[in-house]
Amino acid sequence: MQVLPPSSTGGPSRLFIMRPVATTLLMVAILLAGIIGYRALPVSALPEVDYPTIQVVTLYPGASPDVMTSAVTAPLERQFGQMSGLKQMSSQSSGGASVITLQFQLTLPLDVAEQEVQAAINAATNLLPSDLPNPPVYSKVNPADPPIMTLAVTSTAMPMTQVEDMVETRVAQKISQISGVGLVTLSGGQRPAVRVKLNAQAIAALGLTSETVRTAITGANVNSAKGSLDGPSRAVTLSANDQMQSAEEYRQLIIAYQNGAPIRLGDVATVEQGAENSWLGAWANKEQAIVMNVQRQPGANIISTADSIRQMLPQLTESLPKSVKVTVLSDRTTNIRASVDDTQFELMMAIALVVMIIYLFLRNIPATIIPGVAVPLSLIGTFAVMVFLDFSINNLTLMALTIATGFVVDDAIVVIENISRYIEKGEKPLAAALKGAGEIGFTIISLTFSLIAVLIPLLFMGDIVGRLFREFAITLAVAILISAVVSLTLTPMMCARMLSQESLRKQNRFSRASEKMFDRIIAAYGQGLAKVLNHPWLTLSVALSTLLLSVLLWVFIPKGFFPVQDNGIIQGTLQAPQSSSFANMAQRQRQVADVILQDPAVQSLTSFVGVDGTNPSLNSARLQINLKPLEERDDRVQKVIARLQTAVDKVPGVDLFLQPTQDLTIDTQVSRTQYQFTLQATSLDALSTWVPQLMEKLQQLPQLSDVSSDWQDKGLVAYVNVDRDSASRLGISMADVDNALYNAFGQRLISTIYTQANQYRVVLEHNTENTPGLAALDTIRLTSSDGGVVPLSSIAKIEQRFAPLSINHLDQFPVTTISFNVPDNYSLGDAVQAIMDTEKTLNLPVDITTQFQGSTLAFQSALGSTVWLIVAAVVAMYIVLGILYESFIHPITILSTLPTAGVGALLALMIAGSELDVIAIIGIILLIGIVKKNAIMMIDFALAAEREQGMSPRDAIYQACLLRFRPILMTTLAALLGALPLMLSTGVGAELRRPLGIGMVGGLIVSQVLTLFTTPVIYLLFDRLALWTKSRFARHEEEA
């Protein structure tokens, strides 16, 4: 058998082979830079994704959902709708709260979006109610970056109002000052206030009204500038006792005189220190608490930030009263640490397996040491580049490095194997290194750039998924590029110094046995290849069959978006009858908490009741269930959810919706389940007609579970139907009626108490303890034009009606969100298709539109772009290979290996019961870059044999296949073993890593078996095609 002639120049490696000291120092510099970079990199669960979302919250205590919509939400929406770069605007108007969520284009800087939002709020100020307690407040919201830590502050002795004040002025501020902390938000609604509860009978007996009391309080408590005196010799600042600070001072306030005797506020009202909003509450386990959610600054190291918070907690606790306790309810870094540690372990295991497979093939310790140095050097050097690119150590970048283990060793293996071949033939190590490195240099460059070309389309994905995987793709590309540099510099230099004929020929019993085994395998392969080359059309039919099979598998495989992770935290929504009060809901919440805390997997529970920026109505409650670490519980999160829902089903009058929290969260609003589908109309009446019909259909679908809707139109309303004629005769306006009702039942904030540390409100309301329900309306009194007191019942009738508990808009039109989960035996793709089919059967009118939201919308977008992404990767690789080979034909031969990888990956996913999700698709794209390596190594040597030895194409490709069989097998097994730890992972975050490993292992196994035989056949086929084309052109030229 003829041997391919090596190059004698050494190519780009010559300088580094001849200067070992310089090469060594260069590699040491790369190593040190990587170590320094590793220590400087922040740690997070996923790459930093700037999601330009701003939330505008406006509180108007006492306002109904209808009033909030028309008076607050609509004016703001009209202004926001004129902003450039706005992608979507959604709003939720409920009792006393308006929440508008503005989602901007990913390309718009968040600072610019903030400026536009502030300008829009300023423009809408004159259109908002004049008695709005506070202007709209906006805040940056990043759904992809949830709180890193949740703390609960409880006390066995202090009132919760004092605890809230202490937390707001002392604890939260201290935590906010920690480096890396971005925002600290409080839940629990126990801000201190002076509450004035009017006795309706007492003020009526004295001929007073609530408006009289409100005016008196407002005028008695002011805080304004008074000026100063500037005399000839001294200046004096003016001050006065215009502020009342305590409930006792308010009790003594004179609100009127009767028969010359003063009437004090304490005579007609109960004045006490209380909470600003008595319809808000938070609980930690079974204790009422103030809950703090801590979010990090963008780019901050989540691990060091959490450690700093924990280090400060003992110091903070010592400064608080002994009865106050600060408890860590949840800490995301616990799971992040575990996930990152598991991924780092899998990375080390991949390195160990790759080195083991190298030794198995080379059977030589010096030859094994060389790639054993090249692999960690390439990976560690990548950290230095990651620092300059502002990347982080996260699950995706570590996955990229784990996969890169199998990639980066390929280059070193190819170089070592080629150099070793020349040494075994009798060449001196230095000469062999020069010849072997020079001969293989173009192959290394081809392998490197064609593999990087596969990753290029990932960089141009414009959606949130593209932003997420940008770090993955660049990290992998950098590792591959450094690997190529190391393989062309350090590897041949070490081969020249460490390898020799004696070391390569030195064999033990294992070496001799394995050598014979490999010789038999190569001989068997040679015989099989000869038979395949004699029956090319049969082999070609097999190749075409794999292409057809890959298309069929792609169509029928279950499809998903992102693997459901077990992060140890469950979000829940508790739903009660629509007429439930705060007290009733709080009681139900405590019953549910008792049931949940009995589960052996639950560590702690946080719950919240009341209307605020995230909770839409009094009949719902938010829950956060913190599970024990994965190693301390028997079941994963999905089984725990099923068990908890079964247990809570026994609690009457409530529905519980649970979903595991995810590292990747795209939804901009609090949802009951993982996936959302919206129904939008031009009016609420249209929604009330079609939502029940669609819900009935969807609840019958086996592809969906936990189907629910935020459409709640059975909220009780006491409609005050005023006889306007009668009211007019008495000189009573509708504004007087509204003011009287607001004073009595709106928890009206009528004044502000200013202190050195904080500001507190004075709250006015009627004392309804003795007159609960609708009977309280009979106590309302108004003042007529002649000063008389008129009962509300004399000019109005009270009608009980139903109305929505909240009014939701999407881009200024009414909308309803239908939430759903997907059962274990179905995929998200099945659910989406079932919903779309059901929608068609309803024949919805043209004024009703439907759309998926959040993760489901992202799934549709990712699914639609996946095919184009793969096509782009193939085209990019064809262009690079065409440029490198200066040929239109050879790149097609190389790319013919791709269908085999697709078949293997899709079959492996189906056998493992995994969906074709974003992670698996990334694995398939990487396979495109890996499997073509086999063809490149074959074709490079075949072309060289034809060019330099004058061999026929059949002899050249046959010899190339036999010569490159061992490095092909080594590189494929190295890539396979690099992905194997990901496929077998079982720890925290394994759900994210496993699909990538499964797809890559399956694709590599199938492609390895098939491409060793199909590639030579296709090479010869295209060679004949090229000859036929040339002969045709030659004939045409002769005829011309």
Swiss-Prot record:
Keyword Transmembrane helix applies: yes
InterPro entries: AcrB_DN_DC_subdom, Acrflvin-R, Multidrug-R_MdtB
Any one Gene Ontology molecular-function term assigned to this protein's record: xenobiotic transmembrane transporter activity
Record's note on what induces expression: The mdtABC operon is transcriptionally activated by BaeR.
Keyword annotations of the record: Cell inner membrane, Cell membrane, Membrane, Transmembrane, Transmembrane helix, Transport
Subcellular location(s) of the protein: Cell inner membrane
Function: The MdtABC tripartite complex confers resistance against novobiocin and deoxycholate.
Name of the protein in its database record: Multidrug resistance protein MdtB
Protein's organism: Escherichia coli (strain 55989 / EAEC)
Species lineage: Bacteria, Pseudomonadati, Pseudomonadota, Gammaproteobacteria, Enterobacterales
Gene name of the record: mdtB
